[in-house]
Amino acid sequence: MGQVIGFFQSLPNIINEALNIALICVALIAILKGIVNIWKSGLIQLFIFLILAGRSCSHTFQIGRNHEFQSITLNFTQFLGYAPSSCSVNNTHHYFRGPGNVSWGIELTLTNNSVINASNSLKVFTNIHHNITNCVQNIDEQDHLMKWLIETMHLQIMKPGKRLPPILCEKDKGLLIEYNLTNIASREEKHSEYWSQLLYGLSKLLGSSKSLWFDYCQRADCMMQEHSSHLKCNYSECSGHTTFKYLILQNTTWENHCEFNHLNTIHLLMSSTGQSFITRRLQAFLTWTLSDATGNDLPGGYCLEQWAIVWAGIKCFGNTAVAKCNQNHDSEFCDMLRLFDYNRNAIKSLNDQSQSRLNLLTNTINSLISDNLLMKNKLAEIMNIPYCNYTKFWYINDTRTGRHTLPQCWLISNGSYLNETKFRTQWLSESNALYTEMLTEDYDKRQGSTPLSLVDLCFWSTLFYVTTLFAHLVGFPTHRHILDGPCPKPHRLTKKGICSCGHFGIPGKPVRWVKRSR
């Protein structure tokens, strides 16, 4: 230790000697070069890998030199808070929660036991649109959302215009409605048909009814019907399929019966639009606009505020990536951005009136959300293949320039998100597409800022240089020499070996062509 201190104390005197300075430089260069060699050899990386193997994993990983795999998770706790939501506990108990912080909810139960005495009930037929709200007793008259929810559920479950059984409403019990599912007909075939219709309506209402009533069948014998082009299948050895006799709706308090799912809210809202829209698709006049919270143009892109994402902060997405939402409508991320932007800007003039918000969103969600994407993901969920729940999205980010791809939905399988290795081909393709897009954009930018005449001049000058370089390497003969004679310059000999000035006056001497003197 004393030698080291003495070395640093005598450092000024040492530097005074030129030889010592040279030795110090050589030592520093050797040490730095040795460290670089050790790093390039991979020895340090091997030790780091052995120490951290199985103990540490990074949530982000590099793709090549500059591209990084990243993700974002949307937070829906404050989104669509003015709309009811639904969830399912099992195949018999389902719940609808009121909007915001309200305490009321509606319990939907499938059972084989009746809870209403028909002699003390008021019959309300399904064909009458508004009579279902007469079943709501002792409920705050100002709470129109419950009546809206009841009407939506009623129209979705009991399709108007068909021969369906009446419903029973219990008096003096707040909300208690009973659907008799066995009164449609005595024949089992028609009851099964009605049961399938009911399940279809419930699945559209609840959204997440993947395996609540349906499972799989080991055999399905199908054959064409006589005098018809229809195919009839007889399923056997089926598991998990059952029917119930009664459907009960009753009011309840919300006690976190099950986990909230924002997709169920979207399904619920879109189920009511189905009563007025025959087909649902994105309208041609709707385009994605890049704007900030005040509605002004936002050339830099679109930013999700702190309330819209899981982690605290603001996440911005570039104009180049977000603008792709105008090119096609096959991105779940674009649909979520439209919903967030609509929720933040379009309803400010409604003075936070939940019913007005709900009515407006119900009428416009048809143009905000792609029903084709919802249907595709619902079919994927039913078929037990990875599907999108519109919550977590991944994208490729270029750490050098900040450019990134349009976020893609992180698919779910068996209740959990897929591992990154399961869709490796997809994010590698996105990375290559980002490289291609950046190179193309850089090429177009350079082409736009460079005059075409300058490009032509550069091309022809380069061609001229290559040609002259070839001529320089080959060389051309410049004058004649007399064999075995000195250079006759500045005289210029003819093929006979003479010069007109008379200096070389004897003709007939042999001559040869030579190149210019170097």
From Swiss-Prot:
Q: Which residues cross the membrane?
A: 18-33, 457-477
* InterPro entries reported in the protein's UniProt record: Arena_glycoprot (IPR001535), Arena_glycoprot_zinc-bd (IPR043015)
Any keyword Metal-binding? yes
Q: Which GO terms describe its molecular function?
A: metal ion binding
Q: Superkingdom, according to UniProt?
A: Viruses
* Entries under Pfam families matching the protein: Arena_glycoprot
Give Gene Ontology CC terms.
Answer: host cell endoplasmic reticulum membrane; host cell Golgi membrane; host cell plasma membrane; membrane; viral envelope; virion membrane
The answer on whether this UniProt entry bears the keyword Manganese reads: no
**What keywords are assigned to this protein?**
Disulfide bond, Fusion of virus membrane with host endosomal membrane, Fusion of virus membrane with host membrane, Glycoprotein, Host cell membrane, Host endoplasmic reticulum, Host Golgi apparatus, Host membrane, Host-virus interaction, Lipoprotein, Membrane, Metal-binding, Myristate, Transmembrane, Transmembrane helix, Viral attachment to host cell, Viral envelope protein, Viral penetration into host cytoplasm, Virion, Virus endocytosis by host, Virus entry into host cell, Zinc
Family that this chain belongs to: Belongs to the arenaviridae GPC protein family.
- This protein's name: Pre-glycoprotein polyprotein GP complex
Origin species = Oliveros mammarenavirus (isolate Mouse/Argentina/RIID 3229/1990)
Gene for this protein?
GPC
